[in-house]
Amino acid sequence: EYFLSPLEPIPSEERIHFTKPDLCLLLAIGILYSCFALYDLGDRKAPTTTYDMSGELQAIELEFPEDALPVTMASYLAPWHQRHFGMDVKSNAEDSWTYLGEIILNNVFTWQDVSLQDLLTQATENSTSDMSATTRYLRLSLTDNDASLIELVFLDANGNITRPLNADAYPTLFDESDLYPERYSFRNSMYFDEIYHARTAYEFLHGLPTYENTHPPLGKIFIALGVAIFGMNPFGWRIMGTLFGIAMLPFIYLLGKKMTRNTPAAALACFLF
């Protein structure tokens, strides 16, 4: 009669001990990373009120003070990009409009400039007759189906903001000029793939057709959560990704400890991450 010999017990994998030095190193790395990640993440305020335009050839007509004619137009638009406008100017109310050319407002939630002086100079050079028009009166005519302008800011030759005399006719277009930045940067504008993902998060919140649909939506839903809490500004659309980055550090540390079974090696792996 044969008897089966008892099976030899298989030793379980040695348990990894998370020691006090591990905790101290992880906390130190987490605090250090958090300070760098959260510092100067972006402005907490940005223009939000919109002036919506629909239907081709819808126009905005503006009048400026004679002693503060605009030479630069700064724009901040969303949610649609690459909006096409025709620009016309004239010196007096009774004059005919002089066409300067087409301008394209490109990226969303991004400050961008259009040089009115360059357009005026180019139009003068291309004109077959004497042209004496100035930017005292300015007209922007939409040539796309839809556009939504969040803010327009006009600057005179000294770089000072010049407000249209009839700005009250477009109350949501000139109500947040105090948020116009002295210098355009990541602090006040989108950069890299934010023009896709943060924009789509905004569209989620407002029930709009989504522009970016090639990536799974979960990450953009988290971005939308940050926007819902902190507003549609650089801080709002970046904070959730930053917090998730901080939350990943313990998992990276534990993975390094499991693979190396060594505290300094785990700390180095987490730090390099």
What are these model-predicted stretches?
Residues Y2-K20:
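Membrane-interfacial, low-structure loops and terminal tails that flank and connect transmembrane helices
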Residues F235, I239-T260:
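Transmembrane-helix motifs of polytopic, lipid-linked glycan transferases
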Residues A266-F273:
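Short helix- or helix-capping micro-motifs
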Residues F36-T110, L116-F186:
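Aromatic, loop-rich ligand-recognition surfaces of beta-strand-rich domains
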Residues D22-F36, P171-L173:
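Alpha-helical transmembrane segments
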Residues K45-T50, L165-Y180, F186-A198, T210-F222, ...:
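Extracytoplasmic catalytic/substrate-binding loops of multi-pass membrane glycan-assembly enzymes
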